[in-house]
Amino acid sequence: MIENFYIGKKKVGKNCPTYFIADIAANHDGNLDKALELIKEAAEAGADAAKFQHFSAETIVSDYGFKSLGNQLSHQAKWKKSVFEVYKDASIPLDWTSKLKEECKKNNIEFLTSPYSIELVDFVDPYLEAFKIGSGDITWHEIVEHIASKGKPYIIATGASNEQDVNDIINLASKINNKICIMQCNTNYTASNDNFKYLNLNYLTHLKKKFPNLILGLSDHTHGHSSVLGAISLGAKVIEKHFTMSNELNGPDHKFSMTPKSWKEMIERSKELESSLGDGEKKIEDNEIDTVILQRRSIRVNKEIKKNHIIERGDLDILRPCPKNSIDPRNINKIIGKKINKDITKDEILKWEDLD
């Protein structure tokens, strides 16, 4: 793995700003104009990339397979249509691709997509600077290897997977192409606040220890900013969240998506966090230099002292402020018993040059 790669002109990874992906996914609701508007809004809200999904219902789901499960499960239980029909409605016509790419270019935002078949990987390749692989394909090594072979950066989400799944995909794919980002992800799309307890953001810490040079990320489906801020503080350099114009719209992804307003807030809070993380070295910061003088204490004499006086503890007070040429209190035992080489006025600081 490598610590940095470029998506277009933007450097991603170590010592770089967080890269934000607005996952439009199915929130275009089958309407090209809405898709184009979402790109524009995502760019204005501060996203680095607008991501779509390239699939046809026939190449991603089995109508028979889902119907044979009986009842639709999890978030799909609320769908009024069959799984096959929902995916059919959410699919992107291939002739949209160039239009989406052009709109992204026009708005200075990167065009990304997740292709869900080998053929679609080849189709979208000319339009992409990087690939995104959804969590559901983490065990489809064939498509991951094919994407990795393109030589471009690729981002893999790890929702609904275990340690072995993640280890397998990292070891497999990184041998082909080391420009890889692994995203912690929880793939529950119910928009329930109960989902926070399943995010397991500390897995990022585990990955960081196990693969020190691996670029980490978070693909998130919870409300608010806390999960994103937590992930960034734990080392995530790529953040993906769904993006919509309104959470009140009907569709599979709108309820847990970010709006332009909440996206802008997320970017602002994230920049504040990034600025506050620092380099990990404890030091007196530039904006604290005056505070050292104001709040630290110095050693002062509490009476008028004559030259050749031998200092006793009772001669001294420990008081603010602490001028740069003063002696700080940690040295008090070094001063007691020393001889004063000049007269000192009450309340004056002691300086090293005052002592023999």
Regions found by a protein language model. Give the residues of each.
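Catalytic cores and adjacent flexible loops of soluble metabolic enzymes
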Residues: M1-D356
